[in-house]
């Protein structure tokens, strides 16, 4: 059995790490490189960096900090933000990233997933999915351009259908960003994770809602996700990664203990 992964998420805006609630009202957390170093030292399995306004601004992630991060950490990291071509991805990987993640650009051009997978291999290609639970229709809807409140919009994709589609096109991993839960720390949406796990045959990463060590345990035990991504509980030092992994190991979760 592959070890489960603990993945701190660093949302980047204007060169700094920020964090919002339900993808809104972002506050500055700190500088990128020191936070990356801290999480690597605490025992994170990998890091994910989202340049949250790159797609909505029509630009590619700033590659200068990608190179700085690569110099100071020795764990894998994934970068996302406005990657719209094989050339964009090539530059980011050349600067030191281990994976690239696409979200809004994949929705605009689904063939991008296949082109990237063909060039770099599926293991290198992550698709992020921003999913919103609509109570009226009792359905999960995919959203686009979520880094900018003014441009955020619902797409025509139901989350379940998009999960199936991106796998067919070559996604090697899926990060499910559950917008309703984002930043509120009341637990991952286990119902949604279980539904998507049933149709997802590549590694599935839960994102949005972690507030306690028990929430991580529930995601691994009850939804069988491959990794759990979180931000605010790590940024605000509510949960220490090393202590979290020790707890999960004691609960029988296969995990790399620091």
Swiss-Prot record:
Any one GO molecular function term: imidazoleglycerol-phosphate synthase activity
Q: Does the keyword Transferase apply?
A: no
Please list the GO biological process terms of this entry.
L-histidine biosynthetic process
The residues annotated as the active site are 11, 130
EC number from the UniProt entry: 4.3.2.10
Pathway where this protein functions: Amino-acid biosynthesis; L-histidine biosynthesis; L-histidine from 5-phospho-alpha-D-ribose 1-diphosphate: step 5/9
Broad class of enzyme this protein falls into: lyase
Subcellular localization, as worded in the UniProt entry: Cytoplasm
Q: What SUPFAM superfamilies has UniProt attached to this entry? A: Ribulose-phoshate binding barrel
- Keywords tagged on the record: Amino-acid biosynthesis, Cytoplasm, Histidine biosynthesis, Lyase
Query: What catalytic activity does the UniProt entry give for this protein?
Result: 5-[(5-phospho-1-deoxy-D-ribulos-1-ylimino)methylamino]-1-(5-phospho-beta-D-ribosyl)imidazole-4-carboxamide + L-glutamine = D-erythro-1-(imidazol-4-yl)glycerol 3-phosphate + 5-amino-1-(5-phospho-beta-D-ribosyl)imidazole-4-carboxamide + L-glutamate + H(+)
Q: What is its main location?
A: cytoplasm
Q: Which GO terms describe its cellular component?
A: cytoplasm
The family assignment reads: Belongs to the HisA/HisF family.
Q: Subunit notes for this chain?
A: Heterodimer of HisH and HisF.
Q: What does this protein do?
A: IGPS catalyzes the conversion of PRFAR and glutamine to IGP, AICAR and glutamate. The HisF subunit catalyzes the cyclization activity that produces IGP and AICAR from PRFAR using the ammonia provided by the HisH subunit.
User: What name does UniProt use for this protein?
Assistant: Imidazole glycerol phosphate synthase subunit HisF
Which organism is this protein's natural source?
A: Yersinia pseudotuberculosis serotype IB (strain PB1/+)
Q: What is the lineage of its organism?
A: Bacteria, Pseudomonadati, Pseudomonadota, Gammaproteobacteria, Enterobacterales
